[in-house]
Amino acid sequence: MSGGIFDDNKAGFETFQKNLNSVAKNVSDASNILLSMDKRLSGLEASAGILRDDVTNYNRVSSNIYDTLKEMESLQVIHSHLPVLQKGLQECQNLNKSVSQNLKSVMDILKSLAEDYTSLEGSPLQFASKSQQKVEMMLSEGCQILGALCYNILETYAASSLNKASTLLDLSIPWSFPNESLQQFIGLIQQFDADVLFPVSCSSDISNIYIKIKGECVVKLLHAVSMRTDEIKLNEGSVNFVTGKEDVSINLVALSRLLPAVASELLLLFDQVTAKALYPKIVKPAINTVTNATRQLEGVYEKRGAAENFVLLSLIDCIVVTRQNMNNLMPFEDASFLGFVNGVGREMEKILISSISRLYNGTCHNNKTVPLTTDRVSEMTHGIMSFLNELAEHENASYLLESIGNWGWRHEINADLSPARSVQDITRNYVMDCMDSYLTSVQTAAQAVDTIGWKMGVMLLNISVYFEAKCLESKIASFLQDVDLEKLGDRSQKYSTMYMEVWRQCSQNMLDSTYTKSQNKSTMSAKEREITKEKFRNFNEQVTSVVQVHRESVRFETGVATFLLQEVKKTVLPLYQRFYDKYINSDFTKNKDKYIKFTKADLDSFITSAFAPSL
C-alpha cells in the first residue's frame, strides 16, 4: 500500500500537528507560570519563617526584659536594706544590750543576708556579682559576731564550772559540768547552721568554739585544784584528799573526774560519732599538761633523796583510784589516757622500789651521811619515819616490798636473818632494819667526833623515843611484835643511861666519905678545905657548862624533857643538898659566895632552866 493513512489526510495531519504544537506551547506557558508561582510561594514561605522567628525572638526578648526588670527590682530591694543590715550588725556588738538580745538580732540579720545571697547567686545580671560580694562580706562579719556571742555564752558556762572546782577532788560526791540549758543553746546554733548558714557556705563555728573553751576550762580546773589558789576554796573532802599528795597524784585523780564529765557532756550535746571525734580535741591540752609535768617530775624523783619519795606511796593509791574512775565513770573508752596512767604507775613503781633500797643502804646504813644534831631530830630522821609510816599505811604499796623480797633491800644478806612468812613479816623486817641501822649509823658517826661526848646520848635518845612514839601512833604498830617494841624501849633506856652520865659526873663532885654523917662539918683541916673548895668549884663549872649547852643547843622530843628532868633532879639534887647542908656553915672558906653559887632552891631552878626550851 503506497502512502499511508496520513497521505490521505495530509491536511488534517498538518492541522493536527499545529494544534499539537499549540497545546505544547500552552502547556509550556502553564509550566512556566507554575514555576513562577512555585518560586513566589517559596519566597512567601521563607518570609513566613522569618516572621515566625521574629515573633519568637520578640517574645523571648520581651520575657528577658521582664525578667531583667524583676531582677533589677529585687537587686534594688537588696541594695536598699543592706545599709540597714550593716547598721544592725554594728548594733549587735552593743555591750549595753544583753547577749541573748544581740544573739537573736544577729541571727535574724544573718537569715536575711543568707536569703539575699541565695537570690543574688542565681541572678543573670553581671553587675549583681558586686552586690553578692558585699553580702558575702556581711555574712562573714555576721558569722564572726555570732561566733563571738557564742564564745561569751560558753565562757559563762565555763566560769560556772570553775565555781565547782572546790568539790572536784571530793571523791564522796559525784562531779559533772553545770550544763543546764546548754543543750538547748547548742542545739539552737546547730539548727541555725544547718538551716541558714551551711547552704551559703558559712558557719557559726560553734563546735570549734566549744572545743576551745571546754579545753581551756579543763586546764584551768586542773590548775585550780593543784595550785590551791586563794580564789578556789576547796571543800573539806577535797582538802583531805590533796593533803600530803604530790601534784602528779592530784592531777591524775582530777583528770579521772574531769574526762568522764567531758565525755558525758559531749554525748548530751552531740551524736556519739561526733562526741567521740571532739573528745580528744578537748582533753588533749589538759592531758599534755599533766604528761609534761609528770615527765619532768619523774626526773626529780629519781634524783631526790629516798626518804623524800615517801609521798609517791600515796601515788600508788591514786593510780588505783584513777583507773577505777575511768572504768566506772567513762561512757566510752579512753585507751590512750589509761595507757598513760599505767605507764606512770610502772615508772613510779621502779622509782619507789629503788627508793626502798636506797633508804636502807644509802640513808639508814650509812654513817657518813647521817646528820648529828641535839635539836630534837633531823629532817632526815623525819623523812625516814614518814617513808616507813607511808609504807605501812598504804596497803596498795605492800606488793612493792614483796617484789623486792625478804631482806632484798640489803646489799649483803646474812644467813642468820629472820625469815618471812608473809608480806607483813617482810614489812616488819624492813621497818626494824631501817630504824636499827639508822641508830647504829648515828652512834658510829657521833663516836668519830671527839667534841660530841655526852651529847651523843641526847641524839640517840631523841631518835629512839621519836621512832618508838611514831610506831605506836601509826599503822606501823600493827606490823611489829611485842619483842620489837621492847627492843625500842630497851634502846631508849640505854641511851637515857648514856645521856645521864654527864649529870652523874657533875654529882660525883658532891660525893664525900663523911656525907652520911648527920652532923655538920664546922671545923676542917687545910687539906679538907682545899678539897671542898675544889669540889664546889668543879661542880659549879660542870653544871654551869652542861646547863648552858642545854639552853643553847639541846632540845628534846616531846615527853622526853619531862622524864629526863626528873631523872636529873633525882641524880643531882639529893647529893648536892646533903653536901650543901654539910658545908654551908663550915669554915672551908671565908668567901662562901665564891664557891657556893647555888642554894638548894637555886640549883633546882637552874637545872630546870636547862630543860625549859623543850618543855
From Swiss-Prot:
Domain of life: Eukaryota
InterPro entries given in the database record: Cullin_repeat-like_dom_sf, Exo70, Exo70_C
Residues modified to Phosphoserine: 2, 418
GO cellular component terms given for this protein: cell division site; cell tip; cytosol; exocyst; nucleus
Residue intervals passing through the bilayer: none
One function term, GO molecular function aspect: phosphatidylinositol-4,5-bisphosphate binding
Quaternary structure and partners: The exocyst complex is composed of sec3, sec5, sec6, sec8, sec10, sec15, exo70 and exo84.
Record protein name field: Exocyst complex component exo70
Organism: Schizosaccharomyces pombe (strain 972 / ATCC 24843) (Fission yeast)
Gene: exo70
